[in-house]
Amino acid sequence: MFDIGVNLTSPQFARDHDAVVARAFAAGLSGMLLTGTSLHESEQALALAQRHARCWSTAGVHPHDSSRWTRETEQRIRTLAQAPEVVAIGECGLDFNRNFSTPQAQEAAFSAQLALAAECGMPVFLHCRDAHERFMALLTPWLDKLPGAVLHCFTGTRDELQDCLRHGLYIGITGWVCDERRGLALRDMLPLIPANRLMVETDAPYLLPRDMTPKPGSRRNEPAYLAHIMARIAHWRGEDAQWLSGETDNNVRTLFGVAM
């Protein structure tokens, strides 16, 4: 049971990284991917991955930070990507929901990171919100040059899901699906995702599953809660959770080349 999306560089984890990681492995995780969302956080994620066994990281710039993308950023991400613990370029993509960076800056940074991933022969860890058409237009020409791609924290429509699957993307599902207010449509789509295209993630410390009982004392999500998300996903898909965990671990090995 591998968590492909842990924001361990978040200030919410600053005081207890080691305890969070220990709880995750005590809860049965086989490994976790620490997300880099800026140059600084990519450097931090790598340092944490080097500190903890069975942890790997990504290196990239989130669309929110795209306005900070420069040639120097690109070179430093390229250098980070040479570390054995870095197994994907990202988190990169487009987010037209809040536009913390302009769409033009987002597209430029996304395209540059796709080119960098192709140059390095690495998969991409992707973000898309309210931008599917433009996201796919930029991504599709690169897909045959990349070893693979996962769209992290999918929350799109049925048509968008089917489009992503047609293009061979892996789909990351978070505790969003456990939200009785926002997650019902995604819950209904779960059976559409082939088991060999599914990955699971907490996106911790965000997206604490709302249906956990008893509720955690803190609203902070943790990778230790991945077992709950996996069990709920398996239930709604009509599958055995242990079997599905094995399938998603195989997908992680295939895309990221990690040894768990």
Curated annotation (Swiss-Prot):
GO terms for molecular function: 3'-5'-RNA exonuclease activity; magnesium ion binding; single-stranded DNA 3'-5' DNA exonuclease activity. The keyword Acetylation does not apply. A divalent metal cation binds at residues 91, 127, 152. Keywords: Cytoplasm, Exonuclease, Hydrolase, Magnesium, Metal-binding, Nuclease. Pfam families: TatD_DNase. One of its GO terms (cellular component) is cytoplasm. It is found in: Cytoplasm. Its cofactor is Mg(2+). SUPFAM superfamilies: Metallo-dependent hydrolases. Transmembrane segments: none annotated. Its main location: cytoplasm. PROSITE patterns: TATD_2. Its EC number is 3.1.11.-, 3.1.13.-. Belongs to the metallo-dependent hydrolases superfamily. TatD-type hydrolase family. TatD subfamily. Monomer. 3'-5' exonuclease that prefers single-stranded DNA and RNA. May play a role in the H(2)O(2)-induced DNA damage repair. This is 3'-5' ssDNA/RNA exonuclease TatD.
